[in-house]
Amino acid sequence: MSNQKNNIPRATLKRLPLYYRLVNQLHEKGIDRVNSKTISEALDIDSASIRRDFSYFGELGKKGYGYNVESLLEFFKSKISESDTIKIGLVGVGNLGKALLSYNFSIHDEMVITEAFDIRDDIVGTKVGKVIVNKMEDLQSILKSAELDVVILTTPGSAAQEAADQIVDSGVKGILNFTPTRINVPDDVSVHQIDLGIELQSLLFFMNNLRNSN
């Protein structure tokens, strides 16, 4: 499976959470079957791309029948994590970190932040949301024992690489990086970079382009 996963286009991997969320919604509504046309209309993704995306993972559906919703849901769950609940750590309890801890993926039953870390004495030991903030000195030992799936990085940019090094040394294989710093990690560690400033600028460019085209 590892070789197969490495050959899956990045664009396909980025669409998987969209498919998963939709399938989960269909399952909650009691719908037991869905076809690519319905998925296409719900997500504004063309049917050919959906069928191609799904083809990377083998036979997920049957011609003339479509896809079994419950089977798709279990499939996507297995691709996200081997466990029922995805445990997440957070490093850097500033304004953004506190907001994420307070939110704590409340609409996603399968994801929860269980550990948080900071260097400031006035933050360490406090409770944000339902999570008690640990000191950075304990990061590696706690991450190793807690067996977290991923860590969210919300430190100042100047502290990002050092924090990332400690996260990697603890055995975590996924980092969601909210800092403006591009961190260096080994090839077997996945990093998803989220720069809110860049995202906003991108939105403004799209808006301006749309205005000009009209």
Curated annotation (Swiss-Prot):
Function: Modulates transcription in response to changes in cellular NADH/NAD(+) redox state.
InterPro entries: CoA-bd (IPR003781), NAD(P)-bd_dom_sf (IPR036291), Rex_DNA-bd_C_dom (IPR009718), Tscrpt_rep_Rex (IPR022876), WH-like_DNA-bd_sf (IPR036388), WH_DNA-bd_sf (IPR036390)
UniProt record, GO biological process: negative regulation of DNA-templated transcription; response to redox state
Key words of the record: Cytoplasm, DNA-binding, NAD, Repressor, Transcription, Transcription regulation
GO molecular function: DNA binding; DNA-binding transcription factor activity
Similarity section: Belongs to the transcriptional regulatory Rex family.
DNA-binding region(s) in UniProt: 18-57
Subunit details: Homodimer.
Binding site for NAD(+): 92-97
Broad class of where this protein is predominantly found: cytoplasm
GO cellular component assignments: cytoplasm
Entry superkingdom: Bacteria
Any single Pfam family the record assigns to this protein: Put_DNA-bind_N
NCBIfam families: PRK05472.1-3 (NF003989), PRK05472.1-5 (NF003991), PRK05472.2-3 (NF003994), PRK05472.2-4 (NF003995), PRK05472.2-5 (NF003996)
Protein's name in the database: Redox-sensing transcriptional repressor Rex
Subcellular compartments: Cytoplasm
The keyword Transcription is annotated on this UniProt entry: yes
